[in-house]
C-alpha cells in the first residue's frame, strides 16, 4: 500500500482549504473486464467556489498519479 497519512498531510499542506481526505478502491466493470480504481475524495471548506474545487481536484489528481506512479488514480468531489 502507500503512506495514506503522509499523503493526506501533504495534500493539506498544499492547500489549506482542504477539510478532509478519504481513500477507497472503487471496483467497476464494463461487463468484459473488472477494474479496481484507487479513488481519493477531497472535501473542501464551504467557502471554496465550485470552479476552484474542480481545478484543484484535477491538480491533485495529476500530482497523486505521479507520486503514486499510478495513472489510474482518480480524485472525486
Predicted regions, residues:
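Cytosolic C-terminal regulatory domains/tails of membrane transporters and channels
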Residues: 1-77
